Amino acid sequence: LPAGMGWYGALPRSEDSLPERHLGLMQAAEIDDLESRLDKLADELAKTGAGQLPPAVEFADATPPLIAPLLAGKRLAIARDAAYGFIYPANLETLRALGAELVFFSPIAGDSLPACDAVWLPGGYPELHGKALSQNQALWTALKAHVAIGKPLLAECGGLMSLFEQIIDKAGVSHNFGGILPGRAVMQKRLTALGMQIADLPEGQLSGHTFHYSKSETPLTPLLRARTPDGRDGEAIYRMLRSTASYVHIYFPSNPTAIAHLLS
């Protein structure tokens, strides 16, 4: 490190460490005593003296790029609960800047599909909620009808898994899911993919990342494959009518215009 630059790369081991599972830390809403744990960890950090911050720096206000309201008048239904919670705040900000009306629903709670022009099924942990999700047949029936009449659907990672006929969880238990795409997703004991992805879709180039412990088994031929920054083949991207599904978590600000075309 350059002279004068400190390093702080770890916290001391503590019984107050944050709990984790196969895709990393548990989500904040799942940890009842989160604030208390963070306070204790902050106290431990302060004791070391290694976390002293440098003097504050003032930055000029950044001018956000102008985004045309290409989704004005469109109503976008977004799954959001413990099974579908991997949502970048910047993605929601981009959708609002595009003019979309956002309506959230909870597949775990038994919600059916709200009236909408397009649907986004983000990533998460559907494999941990197989029983509740497999019982919500009203939702899957509505999604099938949504896709069949040519309305847009974007499914990412856990969203992709949910579109298959089955998800096989880590215990080997099979759960019936959407049946919108043929095949199944099977949980593995080890990480199956991790890293940045670039998707050159017909709507435009989009950037994102992949991080999952499942494998898909499907007879579908991908529309195309994403690529890694160094040019290697990445995740398969499937297209059925206006539905687009893959393991890639897309960062919407990377190309708002392409997102608007995907969802309109």
Language model features with spans:
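Cysteine-nucleophile active-site neighborhood
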Residues: P126-I198
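Short acidic, glycine/serine/threonine-rich loops at helix termini
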Residues: L18-M26, P89-N91, K131, E165-Q166, ...
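Structural motif
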Residues: P12, A79-A83, V248
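Internal gly/pro-rich beta-alpha loop/helix module
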Residues: L1-A68
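C-terminal and late-domain segments of enzyme folds
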Residues: K47-T48, L70-A72, Y84-T94, L98-L102, ...
